[in-house]
Each structure stands twice: as structure tokens, then as C-alpha cells.
């Protein structure tokens, strides 16, 4: 039995994930924080809609204005970007990866056979906390443990650094030319030479080795780890180079939502990928738009005369799932707190225990965000989060309330929530029953919302499984094609 104990990282709710920037080859971005007030004003997004999409365009315009009024980027998600220092640059073809700058939890040195560590990875003791640590004339770390490197440096006599894609609390990600593979460009995650980050990286490596060996051709769309090595105490993981994250595409498209046909294609791939994890007795635990990356994020731009603006439309909706550092096997120790706030399932908030269904809840949240351009659970407070759920999905089931240890959220088996408080008014103003978020009431939109509603079932035992989701009528058009 696996019982690798995880230590809770103090910045759990303020973490960025390893996936989104870490594999990205092109578009360095300004960090999402209180100090960041610009929203890529230079971007010229594209979308193309048919008349049958009803009032999609008008509703999207209203959603966009409402969304910006909420200062979503600066106020609702900035805490997931602490330590992230991206920079903007442009190239002919956009591609992207995500930085995972702090792990939700780190496994201890006890591990199962599946996670048996590779013997060739040398172990390094904790190093002194000097302002600048030097091991040799050419190998230096800064005061935080980041490897000091620059364009032109070569790792392992093979990977020539082209540029830094981003930095985070965990380390940095660089784009490299792989001289051992005919000059192919790759993304290399260079983890800080700090014990907890090395352990987190090795944990991710073990999961990736398992998944990549089980699915060597990436049929199930988990990011491919090409290799890993130790560079003077820094764990370095080499990944394929991918495109923008789905979150960044939305952001750079002025938070316009995806077309429903694209949502269908992306949703099917996500369900297939995470179902593959579930069949391998794994739960991802940190699914969100930042951790879903496009293989190529190329797009076409067209002018929308109705909205009087340029909009972007994807050329290819192929995706990969990234960030397996928090993935947990069924028989491992399960940390009490998992998932990024906006995508956290009710059983996690209520400390009722969790397993694979928490991933399904996260996917439901992701799909509604793809549809609207913003997340419906915009909060950092657990009680407010539960109030939003009740406003959107109806009352929390009594049996879940009675079982939870989180009694502080309830009074007489009802959510202890004042609808007339400022927070109560905020929730009432911003949230509404799920179906009222529909932008069009044609059959395909109805099918999507039926799928989302089944994914957002409170009781994890009643929540749709991904095997069942893949058979949902929303995906019938894909099967016909």
C-alpha cells in the first residue's frame, strides 16, 4: 500500500501550476497580479459565429464588460501567480507552456514501487542560505536557489538555452535547442536546488514515467516528458514544446469564450485524458484551464462587424494535459486540501474525503469557463464558495452537511450565510441558476449544460464518471464525423 505522506505547502492557494508556462515556447506574458493592470491591449482576437448561435455575440460582449468590471485577472486569480515573472515576446508561431511555481504538497521520501526513485538521480543535501551560492566558477545559484543561466549556456552538453520562458517559486523554464535531436526545440524545467522542490519534481517524474510508458504515443494527451537529469543539484525535466494554455488563449482574446464546436472537441479530449488517469488509479487534483495546453495555438483573425473588433479563432483544438506534480494514486495518502480554489469540489471544501470525482467537478468548472470566458466561482473564501454553489446549483445535500467536520460553515444544518450582507449581495448579483448562464437555447447548448450539470453534482457518488461522460449526447456530433 502506498502511504507517501504529503507536507502541506503554505502557499497552497497562492500557487501557480507547473504546467501552463513551463512548456511554452513563445508568448511571455505579464504576471497576473495586483500590480498588473494591462490585459494585452495589443491583442487582436478572433471568433466567427453563425446566425444560429442566437444572441451569442451580444451576450459575450456583455459578459466581457461584466467580467472586466470584476477585475478578474487582477483580483480573483492573482494569488495563483505569486513568484511568476514572465516577459512578453513574439515569434512567428505562438506556442506556450505554463509555470507551476509552487507545489500543493510534497511527498516524503517513503515511496511505493511505482514511485521507486531512479538510482542515477544524485541526492544533494540542503545548501547554505548565503545570498549567492557558488559551486564552481561556471555553476552558480541565486539567493533563492534558482540556477543562474543565460542564452547560449548548454545543459548536459546537449541543451542550448535559447530563452527563458518564465520563472516561478519552483524554478524556471527555458526554451532549448536539443543538439542531440537535430536541433529540435524543447522546454526544460530547471527546478530550484531546494529540497521540497526537488522532491516535488521527482514525484512528477515518477508519474510521468508511468503515464508515458503506458501511453508512449500520447494517445491520451498527457504531456510527454522526453527525459530528465540532474544538473548540479537542479532537477531538470525536458518536455515537448507546446502552445498557449487554454486560459492564456482566452486572456489574449480579451476573455471572449470559445465556440461551442471547439468546446466540444476540447472537452472530449480532456475527458479522454483524465479518464486514462483514472483507469490508472490516479487523480490529477489540479485541473484548470492553465493546465490544459494547446499543441499549437495558431489562430486566424477576422473582423466582427457586429462587435466592431478583431477576434481570434483557433486553427487546431488539439490539447495536452500538464502538471502531474500533485497527481495522487488511489492508495496513496490523500492530502485534505487539493485543487485550485475556483475548481475545487464541494467534498474537498467540506473535508469529506476525495477521489477521482473531484477531477470531474473541475472539468465541469473548466467547460463553463470555456463557454462564458470567465469562471462562475470567483471567490477566495470557502463559505462564500459554498454560497455560490447553492445559488448556481441549489441546496447542498443534507447528508453531506451532516457528515462534514466543517461545522463553522453551517447553522441548524443550513449554510450560515447572510444574503443581505455585502458578500451576500455580491453572490446574488454575480451568480444565478446554472441554466440562466446559457447564451443560446438551441439543442447543442442544452446538451452542453446537461453535461456540465452532471459534472457539478454535489455528491461525488452521484457525479457522472468520465466513462459515462464520453457517451454523453453532447459528443454525438464528433462520433458522426
From Swiss-Prot:
Catalyzed reaction equations: L-seryl-[protein] + ATP = O-phospho-L-seryl-[protein] + ADP + H(+); L-threonyl-[protein] + ATP = O-phospho-L-threonyl-[protein] + ADP + H(+); L-tyrosyl-[protein] + ATP = O-phospho-L-tyrosyl-[protein] + ADP + H(+)
Active site per database record: 286 (proton acceptor)
Extent of Basic and acidic residues compositional bias: 8-24
PROSITE patterns, per database record: PROTEIN_KINASE_ATP (PS00107), PROTEIN_KINASE_DOM (PS50011), PROTEIN_KINASE_ST (PS00108)
Notes on activation and inhibition: TG003 inhibits its kinase activity and affects the regulation of alternative splicing mediated by phosphorylation of SR proteins.
Tissues with expression: Expressed in liver, kidney, heart, muscle, brain and endothelial cells.
Gene that this sequence comes from: CLK4
Protein name: Dual specificity protein kinase CLK4
EC number(s) reported in the record: 2.7.12.1
Compositional bias ranges of the Basic residues kind: 25-34, 106-136
Changes after translation: Autophosphorylates on all three types of residues.
Gene Ontology MF terms in the entry: ATP binding; protein serine kinase activity; protein serine/threonine kinase activity; protein serine/threonine/tyrosine kinase activity; protein tyrosine kinase activity
Effect of residue 189 to R: Loss of function
Transmembrane segments: none
Family: Belongs to the protein kinase superfamily. CMGC Ser/Thr protein kinase family. Lammer subfamily.
